Amino acid sequence: MLWLALCLPALPLQLAERGLGETLPLAIIEGPPQRPVIAFCNLKAAAAGILPGQKLAAAQALAHDLIGLERNLERERLALQELACWGYQFSAQVVPFGGETASGLLLETGASCRLFDGHHALDRRIAAELRQLGYSAAFGYAPTPRAARWIGLARLHGRQEQRDAFEPATLENVLAPLPIACLEWDAGTVATLQALGLGRLGDLLRLPRTAFARRFGPERLDDLDRA
């Protein structure tokens, strides 16, 4: 099997920007009504010094024309459902996913790559249709859904040199350089691992399995095994 992950960066922001006629400082906010904070912001807002985690009032002081829109989880869920329906033209197996870093789709593309005479042509077709729908995405290929998602997230984090894993035999070597931030583990676990000098997935794979599970939990070991 060959899975393709389509990782959509900041889906709430992409959905909001589709309805704007011009590019203005834009932020998606969440939290209690009396103290909303910035969850996502576009490039124009970031250029004004606005960052995720800031209070809305502080952000508005930096950009007086800032548009602040409340996050709509139901809209995100429906958008992923619509994208999943769209994805069935490329695969009989389509799985939507959501996460802190990105939302997106997983598609099993073994047959599709043969139909399109290779993954490059398939990529071009999917990317073009996503643009027409108003979305952008980072792509990642691997024999397992989890590994494909991690590779897509690595590209989303700026690792444009990240390789895909088209064959099971190449998977471990392809995954080894991945930053552990791509694993979507909680910030505390990531910080602890980095403090121990364990910044890459390959560093984790070299650790004794029993000791790793005892220190960080069997669910983390299961994540690695499922990749």
Regions found by a protein language model. Name each.
Residues R155-A227:
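Compact, charge-rich alpha-helical regulatory domains located at protein termini
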Residues P12, A39, L51, V95, ...:
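Generic, ordered loop/turn and secondary-structure boundary motif
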Residues R77-L78, A147-G152, A211:
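Short secondary-structure boundary/hinge segments and terminal tails
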